[in-house]
Design a protein with these regions (language model features):
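A short, acidic, flexible beta-alpha connecting loop/helix-capping segment that sits on the rim
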Residues: 34-36, 253
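Oxidoreductase cofactor-interface core, primarily capturing Rossmann-like NAD(P)-dependent enzymes
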Residues: 2-34, 43-45, 53-56, 64-71, ...
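Conserved N-proximal alpha/beta basic substrate-recognition cap immediately N-terminal to
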Residues: 74
Length: 282
């Protein structure tokens, strides 16, 4: 589908990569932002219609800082359909089927109400280690704290998710399906620690903690309580097994293989380097 693409979550892990790909391709897009023109604010529905003006398709990322974000997303989707938006693409999670809590509720709503939709269901993001929940303790404590035990995940690079989103948004045909997006290898957090250790040249360990303790760590980082508990429960699913599945959806949609974790680790050594070591230089 061609036409103006509205990218929500435009400064997030996948959104900024999608914006870059749209810009590089010379395609029209609007990066949804409170500071954009027109402004867009999840907490202010009065801003939505202007942001949706002349939009052909929407890339939909859950807002992290509003109460009951999934009800808010459905409200926004109703507005999008009233404005004549043709295609709606939701970023969900591999572990959440249609009808499941949270993103799964929005997935089900799209199936029941939308004529042209797609849902991207990525596994765990590689970027959780380089700019998310695990960055600070890797950099400052040489430790990854998780509740995943020996569970495995097929970690995926956010750039690969964005490339898949680009392909789905531009697809000439109606898709009306979901895609489980994963990397090409299923590895444990112990193995993640080994790969980051090899890339950084120092030992990074993996320490198992309870789901409750992990949620408390997320709260201490400033995440809202609902988000902290949701994320901790999501990581618990890795210990339970479902995140270990591997699919070829990235290659099918983009024509390219998924990024290996080793390549990701080698490209991100600088973010895990303690400040004093960066100041000293080589």
């Amino acid at each position: 589908m061609t036409g103006l693409v509205l990218v929500t979550g435009a400064t997030g892990k996948t959104g900024r990569n999608l914006v870059a790909q749209l810009k590089e391709s010379g395609l029209p897009y609007r990066a949804a932002s409170r500071h954009g023109e027109p402004p867009f604010d999840w907490a202010q529905p009065a801003t939505w219609d202007a942001a949706l003006e002349d939009v052909a398709s929407v890339y939909l990322v859950a807002p992290p800082t509003v109460d009951d974000p999934y009800a808010r997303m459905v409200e926004f989707l109703r507005s999008a359909m009233r404005k004549g938006v043709g295609r709606l693409v939701l970023l969900s999670m591999a572990s959440l089927d249609a009808g499941a809590p949270a993103h799964g509720q929005v997935h089900q709503w799209l199936m029941d109400n939308c004529a042209d939709w797609a849902v991207l269901r990525p596994g765990a993001f590689m970027q959780n280690f380089s700019e998310g929940q695990y960055l600070a303790t890797i950099r400052d404590e040489d430790t990854i704290y998780s509740n995943t035990g020996a569970g495995r995940a097929a970690f995926i690079d956010a750039a690969d998710i964005a490339a898949a989103a680009f392909a789905v948004l531009m697809a000439p045909e109606v898709l009306n399906t979901d895609f489980v997006l994963t990397g090409d290898e299923s590895i444990s957090y112990d193995r993640v620690a080994e790969l980051i250790s090899q890339a950084c040249g120092r030992r990074i360990s993996h320490t198992h903690i309870s789901t409750e303790a992990l949620a408390e760590r997320f709260l201490a980082r400033g995440l809202p309580e609902q988000t902290a508990k949701f994320l901790a429960a999501a990581y618990q699913r890795i210990a339970d097994g479902p995140e270990g599945q591997i699919t070829d959806a990235v290659r099918t949609l983009t024509g390219k293989p998924a990024t290996p974790f080793q390549a990701f680790a080698e490209a991100n050594v600088h973010v895990w380097t303690p400040a004093e070591a960066r100041l000293r230089g080589p």
